[in-house]
Amino acid sequence: SSGRKCFSVSPHYSVSIVFDAEGDVWYNGKNTLYFMKEQSMYEETTIAAIATAPGEGGIGIIRLSGVSAAEIADKIFHTGKIKTFKEAVPYMMYFGHVTDGEKRIDEGLAVYMKAPHSYTGEDVVEIQIHGSAEALRETLALALRSGAVPAMRGEFTKRAFLNGRLDLAQAEAVMDIISAKGEAALTQAESHLSGALSGFVHGVMEELKDLITKLEVTIDYPEEDLEDLTMEETGDALEKIDKSLSALLKRSEEGRVIREGLRTAIIGRPNAGKSSLLNALLQEERAIVTDVPGTTRDTIEEAVRISGVSLLLMDTAGLRETDNKVEQIGIERARASMEKADLILAVIDGSSPLDEEDKEILHSLVGKKAIVILNKYDLTPEVKAEDIWEIAGHVPVVSLSARYGSGMDELREELRKITEKQDTDAGRILFLTNLRHVELVRKALDNVLRARASVREGLQADFIVIDLTEAWKTMGEITGDTMDDELIHSIFSRFCVGK
């Protein structure tokens, strides 16, 4: 009924789900959820946007997509090679000029991509001109006056989704590629775009769908006495799904590191050389370095890439007892950074014996992923690795001079050992790098665990089907097979205009 969402699973699955909500009919054919009203709107409109980043550049691109893309391009881009873009050889570049009446705006190249073999699945024309902000603005304005409408955030990718060119997980991977902070993040995003995550999700959905079908047979035909055999099969199948989802969730923290970078806190007492170390790693003067203890009072964050993985370096205030209120706030932030860090670089002044503040810092490293740096080794060394291991356990210890750069290669090698695993794994193991996906897999796993408990307790098949159906629906939200339009809009609104 209108205003109520109805959910059903067909035994034949030619139409997997049907919703009737607020008068909108949605259905799932293969992998794509089609929103009928939106598709109808898209069939009538052609969108345009600047597809390149703001600012000056060698090349700027205006992208058109929709039923009238070729006709609009005919009005604004003129070439002597063809009379109309409908006659163009698809994917071939044509030299010409963007003109507004008698006014020539710029010269450039244009390419026509015929539906459905384009990014959006629609007719697409891309016009490449010089990357002048003014030339791009005038060309876009000309396209809009010629019948195009401004593209919304992520609308090109949204059309690709609605036209079945991409599923939702692949669409989100496009954004991950754009924002990748390192080689490992790019590799994993490319894997998601190629369908690795979608293939996993659809595999789980097929297994759940098969179980639901078999259980519904026992409900519809109780006289066949199939329930005992079916329950045994269901228990075995659910154990397999449980292990599969659990393993993927366990790797989600590594996935976050691949996508966002390794949160690395640089800690130590005042004047140990933390800011000098940050500057040495960045190879630029980012932090102020003085002989005055307590100079750094706020957390400075910068990124550096090691072996394809981004390290988010956090230079923190020196850890010590102080009556200075401002410095106390900085120290509290330093401790907070240390707690949320994936890796700790503990800087010790190696030119003087360990004091109580040093020992307290070293004690705090027990059980954490850390590297101890004996700094100021250009002076007379007063601390040995054995002194560190006696307090902090067997952590890596690197002796160096951040001021003069000696020993920095050894530190980078230790960092490489840590980041190399993420970089290597990113190319061969599936990770969840998106928090939305993590939460959905966790929710689906909860449903699977409840279904397993119901099987063990001998509950009726009806109860098990409820949890399995919810798990199936939740997994479908990752690829967009079972999502509602509000969430779809929310996801694509995070994209930039022109993508």
Predicted regions and their residues:
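Glycine-rich, N-terminal phosphate-binding loop of Rossmann-like dinucleotide-binding domains
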Residues: 129-131, 316, 348-351
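A glycine-rich (often HGG/GG-containing) alpha/beta subdomain
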Residues: 27-187, 191, 195, 371
